[in-house]
A protein has these predicted regions:
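Phosphate/pyrophosphate-binding active-site segments
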Residues: 154-157, 180, 318, 322-412, ...
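Glycine-rich beta-strand-to-loop/alpha-helix junction loops that act as flexible
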Residues: 233-235, 299, 412, 467-470
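Active-site diphosphate/adenylate-binding microenvironment
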Residues: 29-43, 371-457, 608-610
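Short alpha-helical "patches" and their helix-cap loops
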Residues: 26-27, 362-365, 460-467
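Active-site-proximal structural scaffolding
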Residues: 250, 289-290, 391, 475, ...
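Thiamine diphosphate
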Residues: 120-134, 331-332, 340, 347-348, ...
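N-terminal alpha/beta PP-like core and its mobile active-site loop of ThDP/TPP-dependent enzymes
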Residues: 1-356, 397, 401-404, 460, ...
């Protein structure tokens, strides 16, 4: 079958299927594209000829559409993958940040970018960055640091090797992440006689690797000796779809469950085992459990510093760590007893072997008091009378007004901590906070990807994205993409006049507020952005609201078929307090007394760190 490289690539993608909700669907359901001279005539032409089998959506910004691809795969629990294609040069490098988001969060995304000519005859070509000492190097090599699999296709027949490697990387529960293929412009249109069987339909299944029996036995021994065990639920618990197994395990053995940002919505807030968020963006009641626990059972968690309080949170000198993870690298961190296997299967196996084991009764009973304290703290902090509403008050109102079917999304700035603390999960897999890479702009673009996931799979409910004014200004153009594609999204734009959470970081560590708030300008009257007018200019239904009118306007937005943007002024310095120690770089040689005090607090905090 004589095909060009581009035609063969698209044909192969179309043949890849997966079973999802008892239906066979495309593993690559669509592509995001911004076409330029590096991909329009080769890959672009092949996509156009197959526009029904693999629809192509046009983005406005390469980073934005790639972030949408990341959020799509997250909403689909890594069971489907979007394709992203760009031209060469700036179009390609614009995707590097989004690739890093996928890499940090262990999420699949396929990136296909144009490259220079393999023949080198027309060099240097438009948008080529020349390396005088390495003619084979192009800017596409920058993706090596932010992808799980990287290749440059120099001959059409190389697809026979690289595409199977690509698909296995995207499907691998342990090594899942972004894949990058560089496609030289001349190679895109070169032909080869491909074997027909290469394009036969394949229905994939994501593997559930079982743990080694010796690691299970060792973990059983440790758990049985523990009096105060604590489970930390991470994102891997969700991707394994271990929701009911985790709940059953925790409640059967009387173990509290605290959650990371990625693990939120594994358990419902109504689950008796649920005890709130842990770590730097967590709450004091949950962190107290972590401090006292003699055993940490990490389920699908990569144990980031925001989870572990920069490894100062687990204060019990006798504590041990068991880590359940498909990825060896994550499972073995900090000398943990590693259970390298699927979370769902591992919990079932552990549960079947623990017999009559129970956590210490007084420890199990703490679950009730901890939950009560978490809920009481939410009520207390959201009842305060303020001149402008706090993030917490806005989050609580949106939470109460949302349905069980709705999906909330956020990313960088102060909102992750506020949602992590004040959002009570009503249904499983209904929460997405991108805090693996904490990428500003994900809130806008990611919501588009999540909406595509919801709408393509026929799920009820709305995608509600909470975004700060700083993130909005950084990357907002995919609002237009969502409008033009007919998607339905609600954006809650919280305007606190700048990067207020970084101002908080500055001032709480002795520094002065510097270039974080928009009024810190050399102009007497810096410009205030009219966010309502801006969103309207991209076709969104936009309104300025207050805390008092927000519920009514949210109801109206939920009945609107398109994109809505509700703008609300929020307090720049009222935050949810609590959390854990976080190591940051504070000068040890400053003459400023406040910075000296902050440095001393850092030294004191780091002294509590355990292996």
């Amino acid at each position: 079958m004589k095909l060009t490289t581009s035609e063969a690539l698209v044909k192969y993608l179309i043949a890849q299927k997966i079973q999802l909700d008892n239906k066979v669907v495309s593993f690559f359901p669509f592509a995001f594209a911004i076409f330029g001279h590096g991909n329009a005539l080769g890959l672009g032409d092949a996509l156009e000829r197959n526009r029904k089998a693999i629809p192509t959506l046009r983005g406005q910004n390469e980073q934005g559409m790639a972030l949408a691809a990341v959020a799509f795969s997250k909403a689909q629990l890594r069971q489907q993958c979007a394709v992203v294609t760009t031209s060469i040069g700036p179009g390609a490098t614009n995707v590097v940040t989004a690739a890093a988001v996928a890499m940090a969060n262990r999420l699949p995304m396929l990136i296909l970018s144009g490259d220079t000519f393999q023949s080198r005859r027309p060099d240097p070509v438009l948008q080529q960055v020349e390396h005088f000492d390495s003619p084979i190097t192009t800017v596409n090599d920058s993706f090596r640091a932010v992808t799980k699999y990287w290749d440059r296709v120099n001959r059409p027949e190389q697809l026979l090797n690289t595409l199977p490697n690509m698909i296995q990387t995207l499907l691998d529960p342990a090594d899942c992440g972004p894949v990058f293929l560089a496609l030289p412009q001349d190679v895109q249109v070169e032909t080869f006689d491909f074997p027909e069987e290469f394009f036969k339909e394949v229905i994939h299944q994501i593997r559930r690797p079982r743990a080694d029996s010796s690691s299970i036995s060792k973990a059983i021994e440790i758990i049985k000796s523990a009096k105060k065990p604590l489970i930390i639920a991470g994102g891997g618990a969700r991707y394994s779809q271990a929701h009911s197994e985790l709940s059953e395990f925790a409640n059967k053995f009387g173990i509290a469950v605290v959650e990371t940002v990625a693990g939120k919505s594994t358990l419902l807030a109504s689950d008796p085992a649920w005890c709130g968020p842990v770590g730097v963006t967590g709450c004091d009641p949950a962190n107290k459990l972590a401090e006292e626990a003699d055993l940490i059972i990490s389920v699908g968690c990569r144990l980031q510093d925001f989870t572990t309080g920069s490894w100062t949170l687990f204060k019990n000198p006798a504590h041990k760590v068991i880590s359940i993870n498909t990825a060896r690298f994550d499972a073995t961190k900090r000398n943990a007893v590693a259970i390298i296997g699927d979370a769902k299967e591992s919990l079932v196996e552990l549960g079947s072997l623990l017999g009559s084991y129970k956590a210490e009764l007084a420890w199990s009973d703490k679950r009730v008091s901890t939950r009560d304290e978490v809920l009481k703290n939410i009520q207390t902090r959201t009842s305060e009378k303020l001149d402008l509403p706090s993030y917490a008050q806005v989050v609580k109102l949106i939470n109460e007004a949302s349905s069980n079917e709705d999906y909330v999304l956020t990313a960088a700035g102060g909102l992750p901590g506020e949602l992590n603390n004040n959002w009570l999960t009503k249904s499983k897999d209904s929460f997405d906070c991108e805090y693996g890479y904490s990428c500003m702009g994900y809130e806008i673009a990611g919501a588009w990807g999540a909406a595509l996931a919801y709408e393509s799979s026929g799920r009820a409910g709305k995608v509600i994205s909470m975004v700060g004014d700083g993130s909005y200004l950084m990357l907002n153009s995919e609002i237009l993409s969502a409008v033009n594609n007919g998607n339905s999204i609600i954006y809650i734009l919280c305007d606190n006049k700048g990067f207020a959470v970084i101002q908080r970081l500055q001032t709480s560590n002795g520094s002065k507020s510097f270039r974080t708030m928009f009024n810190d300008s050399d102009l007497d009257k810096p410009v205030n952005v009219d966010f309502v007018a801006h969103a309207k200019s991209m076709g969104a239904n936009a309104k300025k609201v207050t805390l008092e009118s927000l519920k009514e306007e949210l109801t109206s937005a939920k009945n609107y078929a398109g994109v809505s943007v509700l703008v609300i002024d929020t307090h720049p310095s009222k935050w949810t307090e609590g959390g854990a120690f976080w190591e940051v770089g504070v000068s040890g040689s400053s003459n400023d007394s406040e910075i000296q005090s902050a440095h001393a607090r850092q030294v004191e905090g780091k002294a509590k760190r355990r292996l």
